[in-house]
Amino acid sequence: MEYFPFQGSGTDTEELNNIIATGAQAIINNLTLLEREITKFKTSQKREWMIKGELYYEGEHDILTHERKVIGVGGRLVKAENLPNNRILDNQYAKLVDQKVNYQLGKPLTLETENDTYLKLLQKIFNKRFHRTLRNMGLDALNGGIAWLYPYYNEQGEFTFKRFPNSEILPFWKDAEHTILDSAVRMYTESGYEGDKEVLYEKVEVYTSNGVKCYVWFNGRLVEDVEKPPISYLTIEDEDGKEIQLNWQRVPLIPFKFNIKEIPLLKRVKSLQDGINTMLSDFENNMQEDARSTILILHNYDGQNLGEFRRNLAQYGAVKVRSSDGSKGGVESLQIEVNSDNYKAILSLFKKALIENGRGYDAKDERMANNPNQMNIQSMYSDIDLDANGIETEFQASFEELLWFVNMHLANTNQGDYENEEVNVIFNRDILINEMEVVEVLDKSAYLPLETRIAQHPYVSDVQLELKRLKQEQKEQMDQYDNYETTFKEKQGGVDGTTT
C-alpha cells in the first residue's frame, strides 16, 4: 500500500485519536480512574450548563432567587427586607427554543430510498412515536448542547428508542472531534426503601461494546449493584430454549448535537434573558415604591455619615441635613419621576438582541405586514435558517449512525439486508410561505420531474400517497376514455366496425 508524500503510515490526527481511544479504554477498565472522571463530570461547568438550560426552559430563572440589597453602613451591601422585591420573568428563552425546535422538527421526516420494501420498513420504525421522541431530542440538544438516543429492545421484544437526559451521560470518545463513541457512563437516581423510609440511590451504568455493567454511587465510590448483574443488549432463545446473550458491535448510544462544539443555546442568550427579567422586576419595584417617588429632606434634624445617608435614602426615602447656622427647620420634598419609556426602550433592545444572538426570528417583523412576498419571508427567516443548516448537518450524521442499528435489526430479524441501501433523510422545516407564489413557480417548472414538483407543493405531506392518488386518477380517466370510445364506435357502426 502506498501513502501520500510526507504522510507516512498514519497522520497526526490518527495518532492523537489512538491516544484518546487508549485513554478512554484505560479509564473504563480502571474503577479508580472512572470514579475520578465521574466526580469531575458531576461538578463540571459543562454539566451545570446542561442543567441550567433545562431549568431556564422550564421557567426556573436566576431572578426567582434575587434579593433586594442596598448600600448600608460602611458602603457594604445589605439585604433590604422592607423594599418591594418583585421577581418577574418573561421567558423569551423558552419561546426561542420552541421556535427553533418546531421550525426544524415540527413536521415529520421524509425518507427517500429506491427500495420500496425498505422504505415501508423504515416508515414503520420511524413512526409518529419516533417523531415525538426526535422532537424531544431537539429540545435536549438546544438546552444542553447534545442529546442522547438509546436504541434497544423492550420487554415485548420490540425494537424501539429511548432518550437519556444529557446531564446523565458522561461520554468517552475515540477521537478528538467527538464523532466515534468508545464507551459511556450513565448516572441517574432511583427511589427505594430502607425499612419504611424512602431513600434515593445514585445508580451508575457503564455502556461498552461488551454490554452494560451496573453500579451504585456511594460516598464517591463505585460499588457493584448486586441487584443488577452485568447484562447484554439483547437476549434470544435458541432452538433448545436456551438463552443467548448478544451485543451490538457498537455502543448503542447515539449523540445528536446542537453544534460541533456542543454549546447549549442558553450560553448565547442567558445575560440577555436575565436582563429582561431584571428590567421588568425593577420597573415593578419602582412603581410600588410610592415613598421612593418622593424623597423627604428633613432640615436640621441631625446630619449623618455617607453610609447612613445611603441606607436611609434607599430604605426610608428620607435624609436628614443640618444647615450651617442650624436656624432653619422643616421638611422639603424632592420629586423623582420614573420614566416608563426608558424601560420600554431597553426591553425592546434586549428582546431584539436575544432574537439575533439566539438566531431566531421575530414573528411581528414589519416585513410580514400586509401581503409579504417570498423574498421578505426568506429575509426574516435567514438567521434561523442558517442555524438550522448547522443543526441538520449534525443530525444527518447522527441518522447515519442510527440507520446502522436499524439495518442490523432488520438483518437479525430476517427482514432483509439493507446495509448498502442509500437513504435520504429530509427534515421538513415549518416555514411560512407565500403559497400562491410557490404554486405558480411549480406550474411553470414543466422541466422538473413530477415527483419533485409534488414534493415541493405546499399542500402535500405524503409524496408517495399523492403519486398513488394521481396514478389512480389517471387510470380512471383512461377507463372513462376507453368506455367513451367503445360507446362511440357502437353508435357509429359497432365495436368491430360493422354497421348495426
Predicted regions and their residues:
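Extended, helix-rich architectural segments
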Residues: 1-164, 168-172, 176-179, 488, ...
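Glycine- and charge-rich intrinsically disordered segments
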Residues: 1-5, 272-288, 295, 476-500
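Conserved aromatic-histidine-acidic binding/catalytic patches
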Residues: 48, 58, 81, 85, ...
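Short amphipathic alpha-helical segments
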Residues: 114-118, 122-134, 141, 268, ...
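A short, surface-exposed helix-loop junction/capping segment
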Residues: 118-122, 330-332, 381
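Extended, regular secondary-structure scaffolds
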Residues: 135-261
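Extended, charged amphipathic alpha-helical segments
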Residues: 232-372, 376
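C-terminal helix-loop subdomains that flank or include functional centers
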Residues: 308-325, 338, 342-345, 349-500
